[in-house]
Amino acid sequence: MGWIRRRTWMAWLGFLLLLAAGVFLVVIVRRQQRSIPMPDESMVELAVEHEGTTYRLVNGDLYRVASPDRLVFVEKLYDKDFREKNYTKQDGQVFRVDTDTGKRYPTRRHLEEGFENADQITELIGAGRGWTAFTLQSSSTPSVPEYVRLRNRILRGESKFVDNRVEPSSEIVHTGTRALKCYSLPPTPKMICAKASLSTELLYFVKGDDVWFSGWYFIPEGGMPFTLMDLETTWVKEHPGMRIMIEDGAAMFELKWATKPKYRQPKASRVRIPVGRWVHLKACFHLSEMPDGRVRLWQDGDKLIDQQGQTLPLAGAIYDSLEIGISAHSFGPNPATVYVDDVAISD
């Protein structure tokens, strides 16, 4: 019986070796299939070097330069056909198409919100007011599936807030009787950031547009949020775009993409964001993937930033998303609270 066991063991060993060899060959073939010849420069959307490695973006796919005449696939950053699949135009109006139902929603190039006539976050969500989602990322819901699941349960009336909150409030208002209150716990050491924000994905801004944003913010004493506003494209991985950040207590811009260009106030005359009172932030972005873009920032009527530089990740990108509130909380161990009121975005 021992020889039978030995023969069986040897047969299994042979099978495993063949299986391993087959897997190895499949991996090699796949790797070969996922490389392409070096394309013409006119087809390259982005060329960037990171930690000694050069990358090229071609038709939405990111490649590593493996040799002077060969690119190796790294990952897909966006679907090159996203525009055709998700947008249609009729009588001059651009519509966003729900690919599951076929329903069309008119995109917006103008949105104003004072948060009046709303007592719950669910009353702000929908095509009528133009907001499409809210994000509650915390230690209780650190991953995307977890906070999406919580959001859906809140929208269905099956759950209440767990810790982070986004809701209309009468506690502190700029005008009227309501403002948006955003409250976020600090992120845990394993999290990049926490969030408590309101967003829409019905915008439509493209290269060449001038996008104006205005909002009133009240930050109480305590934790300071990292970002107050994000203008993003959700069609590209990681949702790159322009954002208003707070660095060393002062407002600044960053294009969250590739080398992350930043636009700061002059150091000698830097004006901090006030705490404990309302402050008005107004911004204008001239959209371009080239250095001829432009950013401007006013705080309480005073122009603090006016610089040229890249403001769009890619020439064909569509800024479809505006996120307001605590779009990122990364500073310190304290919770952060932000009140937002009288928000507007337009061309």
Q: Which ranges hold each PLM region?
A:
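N-terminal Sec-pathway targeting helices
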Residues: G2-L18
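Hydrophobic alpha-helical membrane-insertion segments, chiefly the h-region
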Residues: L19-V29
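Ser/Thr/Pro/Gly-rich low-complexity linker/stalk segments immediately outside membranes or between
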Residues: V29-A47
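Short acidic-hydrophobic surface loop/beta-edge motif
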Residues: I36, L46-H50, R56-V58, Y87-T88, ...
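Short linear proline/tyrosine/threonine-rich motifs used for host-factor recruitment
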Residues: T54-V58, L62-V65, L71-K76, E84-K89, ...
